[in-house]
């Protein structure tokens, strides 16, 4: 009798997620590389099981980096499976081709990268079975069950996969070609990336602005009254400010106007990943990568919703649960929920793309927070506090602006009276009044004291991870269409990795300041941006690429058209790139210096085959063993090369005579006509 059992194969992104899903599905039997039970086989990847192969997989000659081999533009793409992941790839292949597996469910992360991870494994294993997609924003049991009750057709995500594949290929094309090109041009490994390089350019530009800044002094006259003070306009000259202060001292000032305005500050929206990373850096000192790691762990523990989101709202159908969510968050924070929960202001399906905002799950409210690692606990509380603020009423205050006249000179004073704390009840900032006394137009006030205060203009601030993430998010925004769905450098899911790569490759470093940790470019980072052409460091161009990837995802742009544009750009880059003058100063070789070049004055350094000018546009060199030296059976030593460059000649002993077969001593003299160098012998002492 034939076996009619039909299994559904569930492929997850990592083992921990597979275990959670398997537990919900009743697949509790452990097998080699998968779990089974309840009609399901639940297996996993280890992130990317296979990635685009390196260039030498296409041709052995690409094993050496040569400019003449560029650009490298594969006609068909090859993949390499990491050795430590081959066994799991084989397991997936076996499972996908089992006759009793009738359907494959993609349960990798519900996003661009998760789609790529699954499709790569599916395609490389030549699987042709029907695919369903699990798309969930929470790892709670109820959310998983609901997701399996509402599986989507895998074909609905073909455009998402196309976008992910284009991103991967674009990164390869730019990274492989540009890294090889500039490494060969400047004789050292220079890692160039589609997103990494323009992000580094932001750091370098800011550093240049800070270094070029010249502080300027300014002076302000302050009048003190009973209970408040007023300030005049800024003045450039101290003497002028001192004269004004002298005129006002011990006089009276007249109130010329009093204007009161009621102002409202709306509650902030919920967190998306980038906004959470920014606040976690500013308030807790966490790096973007640390925040993502903590949030990912909370997600896998079913305590937070999906982390890699770019939305700050919930969907409309979630509005009914906002009151319970607020109560849960209040418990996590050890406080009270708002008196009136404004659930409508956090729900808007129109503003949610793939995933809603990051919020705690209801399970988080039932968890003993002390059992969590400190980092996860602080992030969970930060997310919970944001929910409480987001569902609160506005912050309302009365702003009073008084204008005064003293001796014909204008002064101003401002005060603020809080009318309703609203969402600011959950934050320390803005809780204090700064009120002015009751003032009326025409009122005369005695000046109790008068002082001149000096200030200085301040330079732009160094980037922190908070402000760099903001700059990455908004890069190119002003030059792109208002309706563009994705702007900026990278995505919420990739920005942390970009920052970490800059630090890991030595192009940027974290530098502690009094109240923050700055991100600054290293000398190597500044040098790299100095020699890179505009198209590789332009945030606008990279933001435009991100926008086009989003168009591919939405089915508005073809993948072939996008990649053709990338290939054209890479080919033009290889064709047109030329070394920057003075690059030898930016990228010193580190080789021993033997003297100065007689042609251009740059340093001559020792290398394997001789002694050559560091300036690459200059062709001067002294070979260790040219025809002349080989015939004399001598080799040019470092000491001899130094003597040739400083004195024009070098003493040599044991010179072989082809005529007599004997040896003799003489001076070797350097002759250089600006185009070629040669040697001759000199027997004078």
Task: Walk through the language-model features, giving the residues of each.
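C-terminal or mid-to-C-terminal helical accessory/interaction module adjacent to the motor/catalytic core
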Residues: 143-225, 260-264
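Amphipathic alpha-helical transducer elements in NTP-driven molecular machines
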Residues: 15-22, 39-42, 46, 82-93, ...
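Metal- or metallocofactor-binding catalytic centers and their adjacent structured scaffolds
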Residues: 155, 238-271, 277
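Feature marking long nucleic-acid-engaging regions of large polymerase/nuclease enzymes
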Residues: 101-104, 120-133, 190, 194, ...
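Basic, low-complexity terminal or inter-domain segments flanking catalytic cores
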Residues: 5-9, 31, 96, 124, ...
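Conserved short loop/turn motifs at secondary-structure junctions
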Residues: 6-9, 107-110, 187-189, 260-269, ...
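Intrinsically disordered, low-complexity regulatory segments
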Residues: 1-165, 172, 459
């Amino acid at each position: 009798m034939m076996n009619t059992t039909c299994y559904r194969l569930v492929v997850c992104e990592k083992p921990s997620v597979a275990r959670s899903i398997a537990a919900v599905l009743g697949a509790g039997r452990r097998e080699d590389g998968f779990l089974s039970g309840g009609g399901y086989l639940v297996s996993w990847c280890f992130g990317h099981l296979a990635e685009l192969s390196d260039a030498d997989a296409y041709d052995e000659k690409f094993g050496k980096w040569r400019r003449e081999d560029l650009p490298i533009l594969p006609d068909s793409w090859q993949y390499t499976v990491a050795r430590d992941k081959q066994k799991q790839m084989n397991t997936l292949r076996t499972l996908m081709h089992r006759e009793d597996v009738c359907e494959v469910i993609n349960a990798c992360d519900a996003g661009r990268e998760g789609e790529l991870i699954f499709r790569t494994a599916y395609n490389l294993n030549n699987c042709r079975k029907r695919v369903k997609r699990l798309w969930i924003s929470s790892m709670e049991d109820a959310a998983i069950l609901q997701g399996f009750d509402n599986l989507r057709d895998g074909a609905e995500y073909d455009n998402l996969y196309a976008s992910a594949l284009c991103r991967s290929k674009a990164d390869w094309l730019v990274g492989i070609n540009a890294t090889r090109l500039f490494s060969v041009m400047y004789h050292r490994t220079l890692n160039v990336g589609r997103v990494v390089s323009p992000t580094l350019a932001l750091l370098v530009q800011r550093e240049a602005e800070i270094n070029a800044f010249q502080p300027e002094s300014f002076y302000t006259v302050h009048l003190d009254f009973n209970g408040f003070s007023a300030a005049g306009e800024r003045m450039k000259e101290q003497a002028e400010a001192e004269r004004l202060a002298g005129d006002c001292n011990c006089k009276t000032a007249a109130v010329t106007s009093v204007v009161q305005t009621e102002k409202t500050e709306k509650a902030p929206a919920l967190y998306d990943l980038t906004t959470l990373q920014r606040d976690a850096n500013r308030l807790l000192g966490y790096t973007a990568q640390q925040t993502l790691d903590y949030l990912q762990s909370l997600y896998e523990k079913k305590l937070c919703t999906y982390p890699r989101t770019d939305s700050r709202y919930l969907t409309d159908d979630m509005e009914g649960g906002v009151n319970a969510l607020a109560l849960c968050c209040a418990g996590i924070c050890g406080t009270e929920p708002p008196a009136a929960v404004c659930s409508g202001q956090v729900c808007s399906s129109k503003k949610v793309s793939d995933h809603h905002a990051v919020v705690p799950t209801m399970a988080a409210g039932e968890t003993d927070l002390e059992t969590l690692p400190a980092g996860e606990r602080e992030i969970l509380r930060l997310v919970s506090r944001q929910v409480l603020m987001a569902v609160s009423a506005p912050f309302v205050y009365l702003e009073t602006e008084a204008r005064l006249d003293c001796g014909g000179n204008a002064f101003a004073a401002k005060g603020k009276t809080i009318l309703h704390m609203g969402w600011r009840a959950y934050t320390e900032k803005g809780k204090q009044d700064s009120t002015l006394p009751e003032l009326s137009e025409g009122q005369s006030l005695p000046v109790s004291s008068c002082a001149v205060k000096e200030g200085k203009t301040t330079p732009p601030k160094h980037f922190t991870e908070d402000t760099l993430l903001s700059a990455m998010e908004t890069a190119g925004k002003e030059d792109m269409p208002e309706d563009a769905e994705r702007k900026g450098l990278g995505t919420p899911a990739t920005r942390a990795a970009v920052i970490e790569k800059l630090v890991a490759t030595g192009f940027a470093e974290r530098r502690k300041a009094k109240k923050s940790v700055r991100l600054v470019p290293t000398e190597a980072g500044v040098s790299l941006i100095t020699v890179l052409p505009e198209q590789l460091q332009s945030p606008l161009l990279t933001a435009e690429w991100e926008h086009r990837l989003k168009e591919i995802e939405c089915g508005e742009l073809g993948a072939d058209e996008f990649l053709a544009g990338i290939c054209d750009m890479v080919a033009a880059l290889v064709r047109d790139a030329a070394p920057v003058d003075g690059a030898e100063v930016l990228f010193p070789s580190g080789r021993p210096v033997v003297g100065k070049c007689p042609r251009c004055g740059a340093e001559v350094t020792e290398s394997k085959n001789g002694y050559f000018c560091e300036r690459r546009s200059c062709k001067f060199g002294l070979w260790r063993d040219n025809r002349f030296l080989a015939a004399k059976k001598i080799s040019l030593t470092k000491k001899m090369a130094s003597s040739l460059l400083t004195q024009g000649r070098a003493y040599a002993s044991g010179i072989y005579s082809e005529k007599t077969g004997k040896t003799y001593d003489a001076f070797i003299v350097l002759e250089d006509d600006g185009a070629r160098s040669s040697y001759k012998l000199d027997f004078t002492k």
